[in-house]
């Protein structure tokens, strides 16, 4: 790692730097901890290190008080996030995932997430190794889906443009593989891989890995379903005559912040320019290595790429990337994002295959009373001759359905509540992170609050005679922002039980950050405020003017232009 550079932050390193450095390339004492059946937890440094293996230690917060009363430790378990570049799963993989969730997890569900992958929640220590081995048997792992590394690489779920999508997906996979940790720790611990007397080497990530998490996407305009401005590194596909010719590169987006700390803020990604397809991996590596060396290892709250760009300057960072990669950025090519939502229902691809996008509220695949979604997905997997594609909007695409299978897939989907003809536009445009009871960071409800909140919002829209319209509405249980509220027209950020900060003024395309309108208010007050504003929008909007554009034009809220300067102003 470079240490004599003027852009390196000097000072006492954060403790995470110590634990990564002492971890023996992410091994720690995880293997020994696994054998300790006196606690369901991973202790000491291992609590953090398991994240690099794709897991977070959690407990059921609904049960904490009762278990404490019984003198029991919290119900410790792990959440696993799988590595699925571009979110593609084969039917036989789905069936293995379904079986494990049903038999070996506390909640029995498959949770599709905003990172275009799935999560198992509530896996107890005795089942953790089995979980990794089960996934490995069907060609899936969870390496580097958490921790200070490049996380799961997202790719636009666009089955219409089959040729470009296929190329973009292949690049998402190549980027993911190229930036993966090279340590053998994962295979040794979880897959009983042979322990070789070799010296691990991390040529890209370095022995201390990255200063903080790093997120990458491949986006295919006009769809911004991956929300590029929530990510550190974005490759915007530029195609000519149906062929991918290169990417515009956007660097330094991110939504996380800390309540009360104005040195933290959401930030849109900066456009570095255009590159040819063949330069993709060189640029990806150079951006990562520059952030590795220049990122803040002293203060983790200011360690992400977005803060590095603010501190060193966009042009300095860009010049360093060009120097390290040997690639000069060209002028950005023209593109436009027009929407972010998934096309719910059937569409036909240019290859003649059919694709069915299923709306999964909150991404939670479970058998509900009268709506056995999980069973339905498994039944489809048994007969499906294509693949499944998870979307960054937490929905599921049954992709590549043959003509002869189409009617059967639809029949199964309808019989299990996976197709709802009366689904409102508002429900399709609403999203929440997991939050309570499993997320240890959640300050307020998100997933469990969203369905009722959307029903109330639907009522407000109907009251003002605009039931057919919708607003990008997102709820996140804490300011880390997994629900991507900071790119919504209406964004709620959890502040405490039943309390949220209400942000307004994002846009439908995901290219504007919303500003705080009211702080720390309850659910009823939120709806009261929205009732008034939506009423004004219904009466005074210009033709086809979105809610986010309306509240800015009419001065309800100021536009965030440069979040480093005006997000809190």
Swiss-Prot record:
<keyword id="KW-0408">Iron</keyword>
<comment type="subunit">
    <text>Alpha(8)-beta(8). The alpha component is a flavoprotein, the beta component is a hemoprotein.</text>
</comment>
<feature type="binding site">
    <location>
        <position position="478"/>
    </location>
    <ligand>
        <name>[4Fe-4S] cluster</name>
    </ligand>
</feature>
<dbReference type="InterPro" id="IPR006066">
    <property type="entry name" value="NO2/SO3_Rdtase_FeS/sirohaem_BS"/>
</dbReference>
<keyword id="KW-0521">NADP</keyword>
<dbReference type="GO" id="GO:0050311">
    <property type="term" value="F:sulfite reductase (ferredoxin) activity"/>
</dbReference>
<keyword id="KW-0479">Metal-binding</keyword>
<dbReference type="Pfam" id="PF01077">
    <property type="entry name" value="NIR_SIR"/>
</dbReference>
<feature type="binding site">
    <location>
        <position position="439"/>
    </location>
    <ligand>
        <name>[4Fe-4S] cluster</name>
    </ligand>
</feature>
<comment type="similarity">
    <text>Belongs to the nitrite and sulfite reductase 4Fe-4S domain family.</text>
</comment>
<dbReference type="Pfam" id="PF03460">
    <property type="entry name" value="NIR_SIR_ferr"/>
</dbReference>
<dbReference type="InterPro" id="IPR005117">
    <property type="entry name" value="NiRdtase/SiRdtase_haem-b_fer"/>
</dbReference>
<feature type="binding site">
    <location>
        <position position="482"/>
    </location>
    <ligand>
        <name>[4Fe-4S] cluster</name>
    </ligand>
</feature>
<keyword id="KW-0349">Heme</keyword>
<dbReference type="InterPro" id="IPR006067">
    <property type="entry name" value="NO2/SO3_Rdtase_4Fe4S_dom"/>
</dbReference>
<dbReference type="GO" id="GO:0004783">
    <property type="term" value="F:sulfite reductase (NADPH) activity"/>
</dbReference>
<keyword id="KW-0028">Amino-acid biosynthesis</keyword>
<comment type="pathway">
    <text>Sulfur metabolism; hydrogen sulfide biosynthesis; hydrogen sulfide from sulfite (NADPH route): step 1/1.</text>
</comment>
<protein>
    <recommendedName>
        <fullName>Sulfite reductase [NADPH] hemoprotein beta-component</fullName>
        <ecNumber>1.8.1.2</ecNumber>
    </recommendedName>
</protein>
<dbReference type="InterPro" id="IPR036136">
    <property type="entry name" value="Nit/Sulf_reduc_fer-like_dom_sf"/>
</dbReference>
<dbReference type="GO" id="GO:0051539">
    <property type="term" value="F:4 iron, 4 sulfur cluster binding"/>
</dbReference>
<keyword id="KW-0198">Cysteine biosynthesis</keyword>
<dbReference type="GO" id="GO:0020037">
    <property type="term" value="F:heme binding"/>
</dbReference>
<keyword id="KW-0004">4Fe-4S</keyword>
<dbReference type="GO" id="GO:0070814">
    <property type="term" value="P:hydrogen sulfide biosynthetic process"/>
</dbReference>
<dbReference type="GO" id="GO:0009337">
    <property type="term" value="C:sulfite reductase complex (NADPH)"/>
</dbReference>
<dbReference type="GO" id="GO:0000103">
    <property type="term" value="P:sulfate assimilation"/>
</dbReference>
<comment type="function">
    <text>Component of the sulfite reductase complex that catalyzes the 6-electron reduction of sulfite to sulfide. This is one of several activities required for the biosynthesis of L-cysteine from sulfate.</text>
</comment>
<keyword id="KW-0560">Oxidoreductase</keyword>
<feature type="binding site">
    <location>
        <position position="433"/>
    </location>
    <ligand>
        <name>[4Fe-4S] cluster</name>
    </ligand>
</feature>
<keyword id="KW-0411">Iron-sulfur</keyword>
<feature type="binding site" description="axial binding residue">
    <location>
        <position position="482"/>
    </location>
    <ligand>
        <name>siroheme</name>
    </ligand>
</feature>
<dbReference type="InterPro" id="IPR045169">
    <property type="entry name" value="NO2/SO3_Rdtase_4Fe4S_prot"/>
</dbReference>
<dbReference type="GO" id="GO:0046872">
    <property type="term" value="F:metal ion binding"/>
</dbReference>
<dbReference type="GO" id="GO:0050661">
    <property type="term" value="F:NADP binding"/>
</dbReference>
<dbReference type="InterPro" id="IPR045854">
    <property type="entry name" value="NO2/SO3_Rdtase_4Fe4S_sf"/>
</dbReference>
<dbReference type="InterPro" id="IPR011786">
    <property type="entry name" value="CysI"/>
</dbReference>
<dbReference type="GO" id="GO:0019344">
    <property type="term" value="P:cysteine biosynthetic process"/>
</dbReference>
